[in-house]
Amino acid sequence: MATITECRAALKRLSDNLAAADGEVRGAAALDRTLSCHLTDLDTTFTGRLADGRIEVEDTVVGPPPWKAQIRLRMTGDDLVAMVDGDLNFAKAWASGRVGLEAGFRDLLKLRSLL
């Protein structure tokens, strides 16, 4: 099982990947939205923002998200690490319910290029 430290490092790598992206991916990552990532197996949530093409983790809390972020992710720590490492396809994991993504309709349309 991935640790909280490994998951935080995975989010940092994802942020770095988004910042280095171009084209549609860069456009989708350029949103300015609140973000939460609930790691179900660790019962831990990272909260922060997707802003300026980067993920900024502002807090780590025990349990589910304390407030409803504009973009909400739900998965296990192992799945987060596997997705960032390229070992798990996000679109397939989302379609199967293995990974949860909730956001407003317009944000989902923009975020689809990240899938």
Give residue spans per PLM region:
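Feature captures hydrophobic
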Residues: 1-115
